[in-house]
Amino acid sequence: MASFESLIKDVLPYVPGCPDSLIRNNLRSATIELCEKSKAYTYDLDPITTISGTYEYEFDQPSGTDVHQILWATYDGHDLDPISPRSLELNYPDWRDKSGTPTVFLQKTPDTFWLVPVPNSKKVNGLLLNVALKPSRTTSSIDTNFSNDYRDGIVYGAIYRLLRIPGKEWTNPPASADYFNLFQNQINDAELRGRGGDTGVKRTVKYKSAGLSPRKRYGRYGKELDY
């Protein structure tokens, strides 16, 4: 696991005087936003055994993460379809009282989901799920591979958030807007990679501008990226 603490040094030169704790919190928030919008942090959960008469199940995701979305699910080798709460009640009004072979799923919380119809038999390791994860609001770290692959996006996201804070010595709304655009570009790239549309992204940035003023640091950062 890679700690958010380890990324502070990449952000601090662009927000001089900013407390480490504030940078760390914004690194976490930026990572959560990147994960939610790109769905790039994917994970195959361990197979789940269903129980007859039980429709609610818990995710067994890695510690320090929440399940943002179920990307696909299979039951006994057959695909399940996602369903919204409204569609569930409209199309299966008495589903709690009926059992059968599940055909749809509904994610209720970051920790739980439902199967409908209610399973009518036990299926050992019969349920497979692929999910999009995101860091929890209290975690201090993120998967090392994800951090390495999307380091630029995480850093840009933290910088744009910090630069827009009003009344600080590092406040810089114009630079914040540009870093926001860089962050959005990284989200788009992450989404493409998450869908398998890219086999790799070359890192082009070196965070080496500690001796420059905030505006020059910002300008140099953009120049190195050729934006």
PLM-predicted stretches and their roles:
Residues 1-227:
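Glycine-enriched, solvent-exposed interface loops adjoining structured elements
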